[in-house]
C-alpha cells in the first residue's frame, strides 16, 4: 500500500539504524512520529551522474553533500516496504535505496533486490515519473513550465478499485 509515513504504517525499525552499501552510508532515526534518513543528497548525486561525471570523482566528494530528509511516504505492505523522501523540486519524491523485507525483518539494498548488469551506475527512483501510475489512483505527473518544479497530483494514494475499474458507483 502507498501511505503517508506514520508510526502505524512504517514497518521497519528506524531507531538509530545504520546501513551501508556500495560505499554509501545511510543513517535512519526516529523521533516521536517523525522518521528521518541522513544520506548523500540524492538530488546532488543524480545531477552529477546526469552530467556524466565519473563515479570515482562523485565518490570522493559525496560525504560533503550529506543531508537529512524526512520520510514522508511508504509503498508496499505485503513482502517489502520502500520509503520516500522529498526531493529538491516541488513535490518530487525520491526512494531511499533500501527496502525492508517484512517476513525476514531485515533491510536489503535496492540494487541487490533486482537484477542489474554488473557495475551499473547508481540510479535514483522517483515516485513522480516511475511509480505514480501504478501505486496511486488518478495519478497525474506534472511540471511547471516556468519554475521546473514537479507538480504531481493523485486522487488517492494506493491502488483503489477505481484505479483499474474506473469511476466508482454506489455499491449494491
Description of each model-found segment:
Residues 22-172:
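Extended surface/linker regions that mediate inter-domain or inter-protein docking
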Residues 1:
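Mature N-terminal segment immediately following signal peptide/propeptide cleavage
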Residues 4-25, 32:
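A domain-level signal for the mature, folded cores of soluble proteins
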